[in-house]
Regions:
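Structured, amphipathic secondary-structure segments that form assembly/contact surfaces
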Residues: 1-45, 66-173
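Short, aromatic-enriched amphipathic alpha-helices that serve as compact interaction elements
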Residues: 46-71
């Protein structure tokens, strides 16, 4: 009777997770029930935003080693497979921490155009300056970037699990 009913109620209980934001001294600021995450509901604008930010992170140089290191981590967290290799090869030839000692590179994305279900064409301009913002060069680039939605591995840098799988970028002459 009663024992069976208590067991049934206990076995039916569900824990509902909450996301809670706290101050540095532990005081709760906000809290909300965590919803299940369905990657098929990621809006196209969010994907475009991630690809836009990737170009800024991967190609820009702030001239501040802390910012540049954070941008390197952010760009790497958005890549996997061939794209990770392409990015690593690029950084071996164009290390933002070395470049940033004598130059800054500002990125201006000009457009993002979907080409296939998971590939975008992105064009941008790179303006290289001295640390005092004197122009050094201006170059235009274009890339085909392919992405996929996967499991979230890095909540800080890639909370949506949007991974760039292939990068083909070239300078426009």
């Amino acid at each position: 009777g009663l024992g069976l009913m208590c067991w049934h109620i206990a076995s039916e209980s569900k824990i509902e997770p909450y996301i809670v934001q706290v101050t540095s001294n532990g005081q709760v600021i906000t809290g909300m029930q965590a919803k299940s995450f369905d990657s098929s509901t990621i809006p196209q604008s969010a994907i475009e935003g991630v690809l836009y930010k990737f170009i800024l992170y991967a190609r820009g140089v702030a001239g501040d080693p802390d910012v540049d290191q954070d941008d390197i981590y952010a760009a790497q967290a958005l890549t996997t497979g061939d794209a990770f290799t392409t990015l690593s090869d690029y950084y071996q030839q164009n290390n933002p921490l070395v470049i940033g000692k004598s130059q800054k590179v500002n990125i201006q994305v000009q457009y993002e155009i979907p080409r296939t279900a998971n590939t975008y064409e992105i064009a941008w301009q790179e303006t290289t300056t001295t640390p005092g913002d004197q122009p050094v060069s201006q170059k235009n680039f274009i890339a085909d970037i392919t992405y996929e939605i996967g499991d979230v591995k890095d909540i800080r840098y890639n909370p949506l699990g949007i991974y760039i799988t292939n990068i083909n970028w070239t300078q426009q002459i």
